[in-house]
Amino acid sequence: MTMEQEIEVLDQFPVGMRVLAVDDDQTCLRILQTLLQRCQYHVTTTNQAQTALELLRENKNKFDLVISDVDMPDMDGFKLLELVGLEMDLPVIMLSAHSDPKYVMKGVKHGACDYLLKPVRIEELKNIWQHVVRKSKLKKNKSNVSNGSGNCDKANRKRKEQYEEEEEEERGNDNDDPTAQKKPRVLWTHELHNKFLAAVDHLGVERAVPKKILDLMNVDKLTRENVASHLQKFRVALKKVSDDAIQQANRAAIDSHFMQMNSQKGLGGFYHHHRGIPVGSGQFHGGTTMMRHYSSNRNLGRLNSLGAGMFQPVSSSFPRNHNDGGNILQGLPLEELQINNNINRAFPSFTSQQNSPMVAPSNLLLLEGNPQSSSLPSNPGFSPHFEISKRLEHWSNAALSTNIPQSDVHSKPDTLEWNAFCDSASPLVNPNLDTNPASLCRNTGFGSTNAAQTDFFYPLQMNQQPANNSGPVTEAQLFRSSNPNEGLLMGQQKLQSGLMASDAGSLDDIVNSLMTQEQSQSDFSEGDWDLDGLAHSEHAYEKLHFPFSLSA
């Protein structure tokens, strides 16, 4: 076949495809040859497998496809399949009368491209040329991959060699250049740090710069960068220490300020003795005068159990004990300051009206004051201070006649002037006030016919004397308060030199004293007592409607 004929065959493909048929059965071999020729294939036949192998070895490039029987006497078809695939790399189609899947699987595993059953049909042979085309494409792909992989391997090897050469050159350059070597790390020892501190102290913290510090330290292998880094850390630590010192100083100042104010307990309006009293609502006011110093007394909180002694206004020219920082409201619960309105307002309250003087309540509650004489200046700008009278020890046996009508004794609470304001120019208390225990009496008139008309009993009713009367006064002046719910604070009794004591007794002591005097005295003719037939016994006192409880 000439070159031109081969080109024509290739152009007319699959016409003229070269096929080698191998089968030990001559009948089957003749039928297979006839069918292949009808498909216009170029056919070569043989009945021995060994002969077919020799033909293939002699003519490697003269066959395109091999069709071989499975069962042959001289050589198994699968053996021929392996040899052809290894040596010539041609597509092989297996032909057999066994349709067992085991044979088909075995042929596929050994490299067969197809498995045909006898008798073979012409329709199956018409499309066998596709295996030739597929095989040729696989060969081209393998060749391209092999060429590409070879080129890639060469390129990778070349790049790797170049990279290794460059690294070797860089290592050589690093070894040759001493400046390119890594600088050793500086360890700031205690000695080195002391030199640094000495240099900073010599230059000053503000003027210390790394270059000057380095010159003063004069240490080998110490660079300017090392000194600059250490100086920055030193300044940060110094700033932190200074900030902590400032905070501690501020905290100490605040603590000392509160230590000076530690005596200001209770309500905020009652200040220490060295502070001025602010003028405003809810405060004792007296202009710019100082509030006298009171010693702390735990009995002050016992409002309803203390003896309700008279408050005597005194001058503020008494000596002050500056070491005592007590507060008159120390330890006083807020609940005890709230006096119930239903207990007849027994404790007259102070008010906070501006420019109004302090008042001296005189709710005696069958009690009498300690004999003492006092006087107040009539200057309205003067702010008097209050002292608590001495604990009462006995009841008065003498009654002083008063001008109070019997009908007024049992009048309603609203008609009684328990509290009243007075003008700031007027004196606080009548200067002719007689504080003799005998002058303070109790005139009740229990036998009055008006007693059945009211449900409230007032233990004491006193009449106010005219201002120009020089006689003894039996009723303390009362001034009305704008806050009737505010309770009266009771505390210490007066001692010599204006000092205060804290031995005020409770109402239990008073009642016991009353019972003792009742048993020891048999004549009550001097007092105006009328108990409507009741015996003077303990049951009589239980009938008295005190504004507060007699129990402790």
From Swiss-Prot:
GO annotations of cellular component type: nucleus
Alphabetic keyword roster: Activator, Coiled coil, Cytokinin signaling pathway, DNA-binding, Nucleus, Phosphoprotein, Transcription, Transcription regulation, Two-component regulatory system
Biased composition (Acidic residues): 163-177
Record flagged with keyword Hydrolase: no
Tissue: Detected in the whole plant. Predominantly expressed in roots and leaves.
Single annotated GO MF: DNA binding
Entry's family note: Belongs to the ARR family. Type-B subfamily.
Protein name: Two-component response regulator ARR10
Principal localisation: nucleus
DNA-binding region ranges: 185-235
Gene behind this protein: ARR10
Modifications made to the protein after synthesis: Two-component system major event consists of a His-to-Asp phosphorelay between a sensor histidine kinase (HK) and a response regulator (RR). In plants, the His-to-Asp phosphorelay involves an additional intermediate named Histidine-containing phosphotransfer protein (HPt). This multistep phosphorelay consists of a His-Asp-His-Asp sequential transfer of a phosphate group between first a His and an Asp of the HK protein, followed by the transfer to a conserved His of the HPt protein and finally the transfer to an Asp in the receiver domain of the RR protein.
InterPro entries per the UniProt record, alphabetical: ARR-like, CheY-like_superfamily, Homeodomain-like_sf, Myb_dom, Myb_dom_plants, Response_reg_B-typ_pln, SANT/Myb, Sig_transdc_resp-reg_receiver
Keyword Nucleus: yes
Coiled-coil intervals: 151-173
Species of the source: Arabidopsis thaliana
Oligomeric form and interacting partners: Binds the target DNA as a monomer.
NCBIfam families, alphabetized: myb_SHAQKYF
